[in-house]
């Protein structure tokens, strides 16, 4: 094959993994985004077949949901009866069929001792006799996955250990003092130069590896020929290898997208994997045993069938071939996969029915928005729903939902951050750069102070990572670090307060301004700032997305959000998902400043949006771990705006109290918070030993697009993404299309990230925080040699060892609009329609007559 063909092959195969950004900029990803051209059920069966990963909720999760009344058994039985009515098997009686179904539907595992050793031997022999053509039906997987050493170790596990070692050396983000030699030449080139010295390979293996082709594409072609992989199976073969370590493959994928010198990094990764697999399989010094994975699966299928029809092995062997085949057909039709799918569908339908009941519990009435003294725009994040609900109950306050990046496609450059950060959804590239700047004299002092502090930390790290100085370091730093450790452990709030006071006194960040106006910079790849017309259009678009084009209150608060936590590698996962894993206060401030400018308001007036002179925009940040509003931009206020602001600040302590009381009640191991939930929330966020500072977006379940009035009187339990939308102001459907293409997609990615981390935590999660190791500065491993764990930690989705807190159900999108709007959306938005048709998301609508409809 040509070099371009090999690169294209890898490019096509990467559909099975997702790009993994460094943990410092963690953003939720849909693990199956590249597989959505197939249905959810098809992907589930395929993953179970090729990787033994089950992405349906397991039996214990389902039984727990039933006991918690989250699954209505009537809904499940209705669906089961409907499917059973269409099934006919003439070789089996209804009694036989019903006996199997009634047992199999409960997903019980085979009881220990049900089959003895002789039973298993007889069944294994029967399977081998009756499935002689198994080789034609084997899935295309890495050959090393079905080969074992004489000690019982899978060869692919040995291969993975090699890949983990080399991968973490290459992707190291300056965490190590010594970096991988020749890294600047590329992964394959650097590996090829070093692997010939690797003592874990035999002398013969090192010799083979030393004489591999110099180009990664040539090495892949050579390995394919040596391994005997047919051309039509090559993409599937590469996919199998990428799925073996999806975390390390994912970080390679991300780097190939973001760093021009690593554009073919994934090709290098595949070349190294195939080359190592080739030499391991050709090792004549090790006895290798090959097992048929297909026959193993068939054996398990027959065992499960016999267990559920209550038949022993002798009875099975005495059945006629026709009767055996009939039972196998029954077991295939009503397999564990079938029942898991049915249970998940019933769980989702139960939740939807209860959501409908809650929304329609109180009649929807349009309120007079002009009566609101303050309008507050919050991110759609589910954590804002309880806060908004409590805020609205305390006075004339209207809350609005919009994605936290406020429709601004920017890369932000903040004063106290080393690197620029895209502040928009990860699937969108930034189009502009906005810089924060301050007075030159103040910045000079601030930079000097910051340089002094960073120099101290740099020298500390330098001493720690060098042999001789590291022996002296404990003597020098021990007393100070001991005091800091004791303070952070016993008095976390006080320790944090001391650090904060120190920062305020010695590292006080100057008040920053933003480069809103267009500036010229020959070295910037992105235009800095906006032209006046761009400011007008972005402001207009944001106001339209908020459904805020008339009836303005005297004070409008644009609320970004962030999260406070201490000693938390996953801090970015608690930030704004719509801003790519960063706090969204920057975007809120930028939009507020633009909307206050006279020339922008004049331009908006020409566009039909008349903002009263007494109306003022301010910016705040909702701290989700303590449920407080931090005001980050408050310009001079008009009398009307000041009165409204005073009223807002007056009720805020009560709102924070109620929001924290509700939120902390769901966290395990929390002290009684009735007296002072705010203090408990701050203690929780300050505690560096706390593995669960907040639940994040756990239990997210629906995305509701419509007027606030349809949910204003409902308690949605912090499970709903809420986005304002008025279909009467969107005749061409452009606003709805924008919401579906951006915020709804982000919500789906978040939903499936939580889903995957709950149903398959060993593969899509990242294990317990207490045993994680931050690796190469880019992610975490369990111990010192695992896959790069790219999902959410156990503490983000589990209540305890046995009970999941997150409910693994797929996102329900509810749109308040006439049927014609939904039909138009599905017709023109192919990507969204595919998600609905293939059951990656669920879709419902509330029409102009307030009627609910499932699509």
UniProtKB/Swiss-Prot annotation:
Protein origin, superkingdom: Bacteria
Pfam family, one: DabA
Annotated positions binding Zn(2+): 379, 381, 561, 576
InterPro entries: DabA
GO molecular function: zinc ion binding
Record membrane topology: Peripheral membrane protein
Location within or outside the cell: Cell membrane
Keywords: Cell membrane, Membrane, Metal-binding, Transport, Zinc
Cofactors, names only: Zn(2+)
A GO CC term attached to the entry: plasma membrane
Subunit structure: Forms a complex with DabB.
Family stated for the protein in its record: Belongs to the inorganic carbon transporter (TC 9.A.2) DabA family.
HAMAP family per UniProt: DabA (MF_01871)
Protein's job: Part of an energy-coupled inorganic carbon pump.
Full protein name: Probable inorganic carbon transporter subunit DabA
Gene: dabA
